[in-house]
């Protein structure tokens, strides 16, 4: 990849000038001036997904200039480099090939001259065989009973992705009950184990190195709980499997290495649900549905790799995001799924985006002089409407929003889905067009109120509008369409990282806190006052020790 400071490009300078023209333009006027605006600023993908980006503060010239920025920063060269297996994660000297995990075309993808697809396919075949045995009841616990519950023990990418997908695809789940334990807080594992029978529980320990502090602490607590009932350590192998690459540590734990599912250093944690880390997904919805998830993502991969910039959906969404973040000064983006099954989707891409692009040093090692990754947050609709939409509508912060909804509900209960989707459509309309003072006064007049009677309340009922949104309407949330949607956001993040000249696939920002925690932990084990830190940290530790004594 080329290292190009985006602010030094001619395209960036042109965008700054263009922003001066666009910053006060209202969407009401953009729509009034062009009856075909929706058709020009929307696209349907694979007859499964409609992406409407017409309710943004952009025009055709905006998109042309943003695409010029993508070309000038060599986005297409970077896309080709990723798909070719080049080591674009330079700080860790690694390729970035989550796209290989879902390469349903099975075309060769090489790293260091070696095609990775035979190994990918071998692990998938092993996952399929394992899933069939567990789901069909062939896999038996130490007392001969079939498995009823599966506990995924992981953290970060080893937890957020599988948990999000199994929740999103609950309509496809089988008889197995899934549980996810991530937090090192003992409450998480303790509350989970209270509900389980050791005779019928299978644990998946998800840690590439098998040394992750939170994961291994929880795994050992689960093992201790299991052995209190089972007694014999040989039974561990019937109730624990590993998603790891550390053969020695897995064997030492008591897991049969035949039940160790590997992945590779070119799989980043937050992009790993497509790998063996997704075993909990495959166990929950069945391997055939897991393959459909991979297939949907692969369809979006092919689109991203081949579509011209003006039609490339991940690229368009990424460029619009850069427009708001760097020119309008928007600091956050909200992801708002109007589907309760998708309740963890915002949290998943909170990690996906913020861990990828939350960087202030560029690919040349220089501190940036522009904005990189935004803050990502969100909640399912309509809950959010009764919590934080007030600020989105009438606050002083500009918050671009992605609204996501399925046309077809898995639970067509009465008129619930119609009411849900009426809110979905209404919110984007209200955010875009608002309500003028004249409209408010007219509304009061129709209710028989005079201008004098209502003048004190009118300002509070005015909505400025001009608040940007993207609407992503899915035909139905299926494994295939969910795979497409996840890959859409993954490639949006990649695109922004390339253009903003940062490394999106490392996460050095999580290391310092870990190092300090490892230093502090031994200091908590005795009653001696701590004086080795700053005054605040010393005081906090010493109060903790005093209260715990």
Curated annotation (Swiss-Prot):
One of its GO terms (cellular component) is cytosol. CDD domains: SIS_PGI_1, SIS_PGI_2. It holds the Pfam family PGI. It is an enzyme of class 5 (isomerase). It catalyses: alpha-D-glucose 6-phosphate = beta-D-fructose 6-phosphate. Catalyzes the reversible isomerization of glucose-6-phosphate to fructose-6-phosphate. This is Glucose-6-phosphate isomerase. It comes from Edwardsiella ictaluri (strain 93-146). The gene is pgi.
């Amino acid at each position: 990849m080329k290292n190009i400071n985006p602010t030094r490009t001619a395209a960036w300078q042109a965008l700054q000038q263009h922003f001066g023209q666009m910053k006060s333009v209202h969407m009401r006027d953009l729509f009034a001036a062009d009856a075909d605006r929706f058709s020009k600023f929307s696209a349907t993908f694979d007859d499964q997904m409609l992406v409407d980006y017409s309710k943004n503060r952009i025009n055709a010239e905006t998109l042309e200039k943003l695409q010029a920025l993508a070309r000038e920063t060599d986005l297409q060269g970077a896309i080709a480099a990723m798909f070719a297996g080049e080591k674009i994660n330079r700080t860790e000297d690694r390729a970035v090939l989550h796209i290989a995990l879902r390469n349903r075309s099975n075309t060769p993808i090489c790293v260091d001259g070696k095609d990775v697809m035979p190994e990918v396919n071998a692990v998938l075949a092993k996952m399929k065989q394992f899933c069939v045995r567990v789901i069909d009841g062939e896999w038996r616990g130490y007392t001969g009973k079939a498995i009823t519950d599966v506990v995924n023990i992981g953290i970060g990418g080893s937890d957020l992705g599988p948990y999000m997908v199994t929740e999103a695809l609950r309509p496809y789940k089988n008889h197995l009950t899934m549980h996810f334990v991530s937090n090192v807080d003992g409450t998480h594992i303790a509350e989970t184990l209270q509900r389980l029978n050791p005779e019928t529980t299978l644990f998946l320990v998800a840690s590439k190195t098998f040394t992750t502090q939170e994961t291994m602490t929880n795994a050992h607590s689960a093992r201790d709980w299991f052995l209190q009932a089972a007694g014999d350590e040989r039974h561990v192998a019937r109730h624990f499997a590993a998603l790891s690459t550390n053969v020695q540590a897995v064997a030492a734990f008591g897991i049969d290495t035949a039940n160790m599912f590997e992945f590779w250093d070119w799989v980043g944690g937050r992009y790993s649900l497509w790998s063996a880390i997704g075993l909990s997904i495959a166990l929950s919805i069945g391997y055939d549905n897991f393959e459909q998830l991979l297939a949907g993502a692969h369809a979006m991969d092919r689109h991203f790799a081949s579509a011209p910039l003006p039609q490339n959906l991940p690229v368009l969404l990424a460029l619009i995001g850069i427009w708001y973040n760097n020119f309008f000064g928007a600091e956050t983006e909200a992801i708002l799924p109007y589907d309760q099954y998708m309740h963890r989707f915002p949290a998943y891409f909170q990690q996906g985006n913020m861990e990828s692009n939350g960087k202030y040093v560029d690919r040349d090692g220089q501190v940036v002089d522009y904005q990189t990754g935004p803050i990502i947050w969100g909640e399912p609709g309509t809950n959010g409407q009764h919590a934080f939409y007030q600020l989105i509508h009438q606050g002083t912060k500009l918050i671009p929003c992605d609204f996501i909804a399925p046309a077809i509900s898995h639970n067509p209960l009465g008129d619930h889905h119609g009411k849900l989707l009426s809110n979905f459509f209404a919110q984007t309309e209200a955010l875009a067009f608002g309500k003028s003072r004249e409209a408010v006064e007219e509304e009061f007049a129709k209710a028989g109120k005079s201008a004098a009677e209502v003048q004190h309340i009118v300002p509070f009922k005015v909505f400025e509008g001009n608040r940007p949104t993207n609407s992503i309407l899915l035909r139905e949330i299926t494994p295939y369409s969910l795979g497409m949607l996840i890959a859409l956001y993954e490639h949006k993040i990649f695109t922004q990282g390339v253009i903003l000249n940062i490394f999106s696939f490392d996460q050095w920002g999580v290391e310092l806190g870990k190092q300090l925690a490892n230093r502090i932990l031994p200091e908590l084990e005795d009653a001696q006052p701590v004086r080795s830190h700053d005054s605040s940290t010393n005081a906090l530790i010493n109060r903790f020790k005093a209260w715990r004594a």
